[in-house]
Amino acid sequence: MSDFVDRVTVHVKGGDGGNGSAGIRREKYKPLAGPNGGNGGDGGSVVFVADRNATSLLDYRFMPHRVAGSGTMGLGDNKDGSKGEDLILPVPCGTVVFEARGEQGKAKHPGAQLADLRHEGDRCVVAQGGAGGLGNIALANKTRRAPGFALLGELGEERDVILELKSIADVALVGFPSAGKSSLIAAMSSAKPKIADYPFTTLVPNLGVVIAGDSRYTIADVPGLIPGASEGKGLGLEFLRHIERTEIIAHVIDCATLEPDRDPMSDYHALENELALYADKLELPLGAIPIPERPRIVILNKIDVPEAKELAEFVRPEFERLGLKVFEISTASHEGLKELNFALSALVHEMREEVANREQAEEEARVVIKPLETKGRRPRRADEGGSALEFTVERRELGNGEVFFEVRGVKPERWVMQTNFDNDEAVGYLADRLAKLGVEDELRRKGAHPGDEVRIGRGARMVEFDWDPTISAGAEMLDGSNLGARGKDLRLEEQDPRTHRRSNAERRAQYHEMMDARAAVRDAMMAERKAGHWADPTVDDDRHDENSLFGHGESSEDGETEE
């Protein structure tokens, strides 16, 4: 079994975000000192990276399911959860990543192109990790000082992608089966492809590195092509894509073939026709030269056979009239290989400069819009960009006449995933967010009535409930005597004088209050003095006062005290 695999379907999943914590800080003499739950950690992402040390996609055929690490849950004492580890997957340079399309359980076909990893170090995030849920300390504000809930972590992105390897070489050897392409690459480089005297010996592309003086370049031996290859005949479409990256196309023509209706010129035109048909279906990468515009050379092979050498000398002027460079070689005797080697080296050098100039010009012409950086939070995915219409509400009707309302949008669907429906306060918080966004108003405009079924999202992440626009998210959702607005626990407002440290403002207020009380007492005493209460110390208005000037006992009529 060959270890060369150039197309696989991979199921990838980003790590889930960790849940936030709804912790409460505890201090001496104060068991409820406020929220201190930390945020959950973000989930890791699945990233493909072009690596020159990778040569095949074989590993992904036997291990097609790849999952990144999940974030951990937040903890009390304001401790955030750790971030999940990104899953870095190396792929060969020249790998193209496509979105997989097709029904579940059936073979997938390539959809939209996600990335073209042509150069060493090129990266593509194919499955974004979920954001960690916020802890209750992050949800607290002036009006919600003690949230009794936290947000759940988001699920990581999950999808199928198709990886296609398109070999990166400077020169592509194309020709009919048994034209001598594998023998040529073996003679010019250290590659050791399988060589035999029957068609379609080469079943996978072979790459060889050729050295010409101080320069080097790579040659790709593409499996043999036949008429109809652009439509999938033979091994056509399976390997035609390997010439998309090459800068030079070299036609290897067998001048010693004994097949009827075969001659060098007809072989050349048949191959060019297949290349032209295939080129119409291509979407070229940045800086690539269209296949019809790429330089061609013609290699007339097997001239060690006398009849083949005569045929090569006969057809050479016809190729030259087409403006093509022609080389007569023999892979058996190595005749003409040195001239071919240095001619290809010079042509490769010219094409590398032209491709580099094209890439630079096209790169300058592109407008690149980069998202804003987020502080310590998971970056947004490409499908999460904000828009004027952040959600939609549609009235749907089932076949049995039942009606429901479907809410779609990035924010509502994310909020639903973040909500713990076992916590009434969290459900009330979700209701507030949806109402503030305008979902309830839009439901009324669409004709929704209390008790109607509402669905938010689709698929496995859909949430279904009966709409109740009068649901209270206020104090009645809290049990016990410590009633207040949602997210406010009156027990947290109590201050223990043994542990509470007064601020300067509180000290000043208490000082002024004490001084005002003293001033009021002095004013009252002065008023009594002016009224004459202090003129005769023997006079007491209240004879029943035990603390009067007469002391204990009863007073006589003349004011003397009886013992």
Swiss-Prot record:
Query: What's any one GO cellular component for it?
Result: cytoplasm
GO BP terms: ribosome biogenesis
Instruction: Please list the GO terms describing molecular function.
Output: GTP binding; GTPase activity; magnesium ion binding
Sequence segments annotated as region (Disordered): 478-509, 528-563
| Pfam families the record matches | DUF1967, GTP1_OBG, MMR_HSR1
Q: Which cofactor does it need?
A: Mg(2+)
Task: Please report the organism this UniProt entry assigns to the protein.
Answer: Bifidobacterium longum subsp. infantis (strain ATCC 15697 / DSM 20088 / JCM 1222 / NCTC 11817 / S12)
What family, per the record?
Belongs to the TRAFAC class OBG-HflX-like GTPase superfamily. OBG GTPase family.
This one is known as: GTPase Obg
Instruction: Outline the extent of the OBG-type G domain.
Output: 169-349
Q: Where does Mg(2+) bind?
A: S182, T202
Query: Which positions does UniProt annotate for GTP binding?
Result: 175-182, 200-204, 221-224, 301-304, 330-332
Taxonomically, the superkingdom here is Bacteria
- PROSITE patterns xrefs: G_OBG, GTP1_OBG, OBG, OCT
Among its keywords, does the record have Membrane?
A: no
Enumerate the spans annotated as Obg domain: 2-168
User: What coarse category fits the chief subcellular location reported for this protein?
Assistant: cytoplasm
Q: Where is the composition biased (Basic and acidic residues)?
A: 486-509
Compartments where found: Cytoplasm
Which keywords label this protein? Cytoplasm, GTP-binding, Hydrolase, Magnesium, Metal-binding, Nucleotide-binding
Q: Does the keyword Hydrolase apply?
A: yes
Provide the E.C. number(s) assigned to this enzyme: 3.6.5.-
Q: Which residues are in the OCT domain?
A: 383-469
Query: Which InterPro entries does the record match to this protein?
Result: G_OBG, GTP-bd, GTP-bd_Obg/CgtA, GTP-bd_prot_GTP1/OBG_C_sf, GTP1-OBG_CS, GTP1_OBG_dom, GTP1_OBG_dom_sf, OBG_GTPase
On subunit structure and binding partners, the annotation says: Monomer.
Q: What does this protein do?
A: An essential GTPase which binds GTP, GDP and possibly (p)ppGpp with moderate affinity, with high nucleotide exchange rates and a fairly low GTP hydrolysis rate. Plays a role in control of the cell cycle, stress response, ribosome biogenesis and in those bacteria that undergo differentiation, in morphogenesis control.
